[in-house]
């Protein structure tokens, strides 16, 4: 079974793409669930500052491949039943860990949108909304602290998400068809 990771900057549309994969038979695993669970376990409010703090603490404890390590059992269990889509791989180290572990069964789909488009989405979304300052700070932190650019650069497929949801669905279904043709 395939493991497909969706990567991109905040607001690019990673979760939308992962949901489209899910609707097409993939089991969706959201790496950020580990963060949410840890924030809750620590009795903290779920907000950007606390999420960033927990993400960085987990990476301090487990290394930069923390989220791949912490989600590996969930991925392996899901993979026994179906192809898997990962929503939220971030670091180069997570990428190399999963690429080494799954080899030819591991694929990366990058979702790209311009900063202007992403910031508009992030300041307008209903859950986990960010201010413009929080969005730009998150971009900087993710590029500087967690090596987010590498997995985007190494993607097997790239989707430009500057248009409509209808167009995004069309693009994603094309990628899914190409992946299924690789069996």
Language model features with spans:
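Small-molecule kinase domains that catalyze NTP-dependent phosphoryl transfer to phosphate-bearing small molecules
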Residues: 65, 124-178
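P-loop (Walker A) phosphate-binding loop of NTP-binding proteins
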Residues: 9, 21
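Conserved phosphate-donor/acceptor-positioning beta-strand/loop module used by diverse small-molecule
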Residues: 87-88, 101-126
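ATP-binding Walker
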Residues: 12
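ATP-dependent small-molecule kinase phosphotransfer cores
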Residues: 27-97, 128, 133
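Extreme N-terminal starter segment of soluble prokaryotic enzymes
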Residues: 1-4
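Short, well-ordered beta-strand core segments
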Residues: 28, 108, 157-160
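Walker A/P-loop
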Residues: 15
């Amino acid at each position: 079974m395939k493991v497909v990771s969706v990567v991109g900057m905040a607001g690019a549309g990673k979760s939308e793409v992962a949901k489209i994969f899910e609707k097409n038979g993939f089991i969706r695993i959201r790496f950020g669930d580990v963060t949410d669970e840890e924030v809750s376990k620590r009795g903290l409010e779920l907000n950007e500052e606390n999420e960033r703090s927990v993400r960085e603490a987990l990476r301090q404890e487990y290394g930069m491949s923390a989220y791949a390590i912490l989600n590996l059992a969930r991925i392996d269990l899901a993979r026994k039943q179906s192809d898997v889509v990962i929503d939220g791989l971030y670091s180069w180290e997570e990428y190399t860990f999963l690429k080494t572990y799954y080899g030819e069964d591991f694929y990366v789909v990058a979702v790209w949108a311009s900063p202007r488009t992403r910031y508009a989405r992030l300041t307008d979304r209903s859950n986990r909304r960010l201010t413009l300052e929080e969005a730009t700070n998150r971009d900087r932190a993710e590029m500087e602290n967690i090596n987010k650019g590498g997995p985007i650069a190494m993607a097997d497929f790239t989707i430009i998400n500057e248009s409509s949801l209808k167009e995004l669905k069309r693009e994603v279904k094309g990628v899914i068809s190409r992946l299924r043709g690789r069996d």
